[in-house]
């Protein structure tokens, strides 16, 4: 993946800076594949399994983190193909056919959209829970509808990439299909629906949460409200996700803005290619950072993990109910 892009034949591609940047990004990718991928697979899988094994104690934030964990597993599975395989790189260990490339692109887009949607909905639902505790909208019983909305919306938004894939095979027979091969239009849709809209939703929710936090209301004495650690987890997750995904969406936005036929000098084109590669690397790294935040900030996760291990140890045998789990269910009732 890591190269100076299409200007390998230009003078700047042979400069020491270009070679050093390529080498540095290659080392980072190897470190991520060697350490980040196992961490991401392990913690994301534990996050999903621990919450599914403790459905009775799941809260709405847990549902969104499960969605982000599943998306993280998808991103982790795609990481080796992206970080080591694109055909334009001198460092590539293998090349991808056009069909495989578009398939990976669709999966990557779906995972990124699920991550951003879940982050935005986490912020909005946290505000609802703070403003109106025990509401139906923030109820965990809406899990099926929420997951359907998040994943269904991500798939529909990525449909433009699917149309591009189909039209690349039938354009010789259907002239109108050639109009759907505009990848810049697909990128613009992803930037608008996958980044701008969730970003505005998060900013709106954080502003409302901040305003509620300054107000002293009788609801603040309600012991059934969300644990304060959830607020820290929310802020850390929002900052992490948008911090790691913003460079990637900015690179897509730049591609859209520079697709009007304007030429870019070779020197700047090389810098932009390296910046795009680094942005995609940061996007992949989000899949390993988020479950670590959940692990170390969410106070309920260690208990869920213990119950998961207990169930795995018991197997098909009947296990005695966990007292801590019963207390947590009673507290949420």
Curated annotation (Swiss-Prot):
Effect of residue 90 to A: Decreased affinity for CHLSN
Gene Ontology CC: plasma membrane
Glycosylation sites recorded in the entry for this protein: 8
CDD domains: 7tmA_GPR146
Stretches that traverse the bilayer: 23-43, 65-85, 102-122, 146-166, 189-209, 233-253, 278-298
Organism: Mus musculus
Consequence of changing residue 169 to A: Decreased affinity for CHLSN
Gene behind the chain: Gpr146
Protein name: G-protein coupled receptor 146
Single GO molecular function: G protein-coupled receptor activity
Highest taxon in the source lineage: Eukaryota
Gene3D superfamilies per UniProt: Rhodopsin 7-helix transmembrane proteins
Cell compartment(s), UniProt: Cell membrane
Membrane association type: Multi-pass membrane protein
